[in-house]
Amino acid sequence: MHPSSDKAPLFSLTELGGGRFALSGALGFSTAKAILAASKRLFAEHAVLKIEFSAVTHSDTAGLALLLEWINWAKHYRREIRYFNIPQPILAIARISEVSELLHAGERWTGPVQAPEASTGSRS
């Protein structure tokens, strides 16, 4: 997926299979809205998401906001989300903003509660 404006730096959100995704290019003000729109469709069918950021070339506070939005989405829809190789600028902004711990909040399983198995005893 790419943003529609030719002036905006490009990004790519690639599905690698099994709930794994790779984001490359810009992760910031110029692309965050388009990345969010693309991710809604791509993430919907996965209970566990693993997102790789090693190919991100630019990031800013909007990138941090997007990562936090994905965590909020994951909690709301009872998904697990893990981030790999978060860009250093985003980590620095998160540290200064005192939200570093939130970047790991989506890592624990928050799936739906399973109903207990039905009793095998006979009913009268």
Please give the residue ranges for each predicted region.
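STAS-like cytosolic regulatory interaction modules
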Residues: 1-59, 69-124
